[in-house]
Amino acid sequence: MAGHSKFKNIQHRKGAQDKKRAKVFTKLIREIVTAVKTGSSNIPENNPRLRNALTAARSQNLPKERIDKAINSADDANTENYTEIRYEGYAPNGIAIIVEALTDNKNRTAAEVRSGFTKYGGSLGETGSVNYLFKHCGVIQYPTNIASNEDIFEAAIEAGGDDIVSDEIFHTIYTDIENFSKVLEFLTGKYGIPEDSYIGWIPLNTIIIDDKEKAEKLLKLVEILEESDDVQRVFGNYELSDDVYEIIQGEE
């Protein structure tokens, strides 16, 4: 997977999310509820998706009482049922975008996503129009100070990980989707709760954005998509150049 060592770009997006913690919590709670409903169990040991959702929630410091409330509410017949939907399209300059959503109203979500693409010069395509440019896999991230490159590499391979990339910010472990829960559980037992963990779409190759105006327009598109409570994650096959990244960071 080319270009996947440059996780400073993802850190930029995470920083934007941190400013909207209430929305982050809403997305986490929605995933917990969906995990219980689709997994037919509110017991983490019997429900891999719920285990993964709880790890993600704890990494974002979602309070325990809200986690417990979400798990219990999933058994309530009045609790909304959420549908998983994937949207695909292009941002300006040929950047492929994948949007994953959990929604109780498909029409509302589709309208919000389409509006976001249109507002910033993108175009929403059919499902399957860009996913061939990505690998669907598990991603687990730890800060680099958690362990040496060698130690975490050995642990990841022992756990069943496929690949690991270490840079100045993260150790990033990639897994097959089938092995994700097993690897996450192993590494959590060894190193604690990761900085982030999810099943997502990682670009096979990335397009370097070396123009500040183009980068700002792209990041605004990603941000407006992420602002929707229905949208869980946004993925793109882009990477900011070092110079552009430093300029944008300096303006925030």
Swiss-Prot record:
GO terms for molecular function: DNA binding. Gene3D superfamilies: 1.10.10.200, 3.30.70.980. Pfam families: TACO1_YebC_N, Transcrip_reg. InterPro entries: Integrase-like_N, TACO1_YebC-like_2nd/3rd_dom, TACO1_YebC_N, Transcrip_reg_TACO1-like, Transcrip_reg_TACO1-like_dom3, YebC-like. One of its GO terms (biological process) is regulation of DNA-templated transcription. Keywords: Cytoplasm, DNA-binding, Transcription, Transcription regulation. It is found in: Cytoplasm. GO terms for cellular component: cytoplasm. Residues 1-21 are annotated as: Disordered. SUPFAM superfamilies: YebC-like. PANTHER family: PTHR12532:SF11, TRANSLATIONAL ACTIVATOR OF CYTOCHROME C OXIDASE 1. Belongs to the TACO1 family. This is Probable transcriptional regulatory protein RF_0799. It comes from Rickettsia felis (strain ATCC VR-1525 / URRWXCal2).
